[in-house]
Regions:
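Feature captures hydrophobic
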Residues: 1-152
Length: 152
């Protein structure tokens, strides 16, 4: 599956996910102060694997416990702003995090989930990162991606 097909599959994912972030009191509380004194955007890079032929790159513009916007980036598209953190792993590792409902920090410590950028910031806001992961796991697009396709 290439980017164009992923985009069709995603439907209203970006709006729905952003709305769910903004409606989460748990995330809002855990992310209080995020992006206020520093750039708050992050990117999840889910490396192509199995049937998914293009990387899935999700840009999240976050500030002070709120979502300002989310974008599913095309393969060579630059993010609107330089993210402070990029979380990178193959799709099958992201799937494993979701299905095991594991704390992302365990995957970071084992080196299976790589962090590029300001590591200390993400560690300081680890509860917010965990809440964001929980919210992402409930999104229809990601559920379909992780369950309906062979990720290798």
């Amino acid at each position: 599956m290439k980017y164009e097909e992923l985009l069709k599959l995603s439907g209203n994912f970006t709006k729905e996910f952003c709305k769910n972030i903004n409606n989460s009191s748990e995330y809002s509380q855990a992310a209080k102060g995020w992006g206020v004194e520093f750039e708050g955007s992050i990117m999840w890079l889910m490396g192509a694997s199995g049937e998914i032929k293009d990387d899935v790159r999700i840009y999240l513009n976050l500030k002070d416990g709120k979502c300002l916007g989310i974008k599913l980036l095309a393969p060579n598209e630059a993010p609107p702003r330089n993210p402070i953190v990029i979380l990178r792993a193959p799709l099958n590792i992201w799937k494993e995090m979701r299905t095991k409902r594991s704390n992302p920090n365990q995957f970071i410590m084992s080196g299976r989930l790589k962090i590029e950028g300001n590591v200390s910031i993400i560690m300081r806001y680890s509860k917010a990162a965990t809440e964001l992961g929980k919210l992402a796991g409930r999104q229809t697009f990601l559920k379909k991606l992780f369950t309906e396709y062979d990720l290798g």
